[in-house]
């Protein structure tokens, strides 16, 4: 039994979110929650939210036992980027791309 949760358009770059995803891949759900709680990164907060959602989905929809759940797969895909402009010298402007990503997390036993 595999249950997933997805967070789309998270306002963090995919490269930075993958650093946190690598920390929890393959761990038990309880270990992953502890790891994410004490990881001082913005993407850790987002990843914890997705993990808690996946746990709730497994418990409510499938009636799964939380103690046996593991993080089966977690991957981060690049999302659409927000284009912004910042003022530069002599009336010019530079484009700034604010990156987003899609976080997909699957738990199972």
Curated annotation (Swiss-Prot):
Disulfide bonds: none annotated. Belongs to the universal ribosomal protein uL22 family. Keywords: Ribonucleoprotein, Ribosomal protein, RNA-binding, rRNA-binding. GO terms for biological process: translation. Transmembrane segments: none annotated. SUPFAM superfamilies: Ribosomal protein L22. It comes from the Bacteria. The keyword rRNA-binding applies. The lineage of its organism: Bacteria, Pseudomonadati, Pseudomonadota, Betaproteobacteria, Neisseriales. This is Large ribosomal subunit protein uL22.
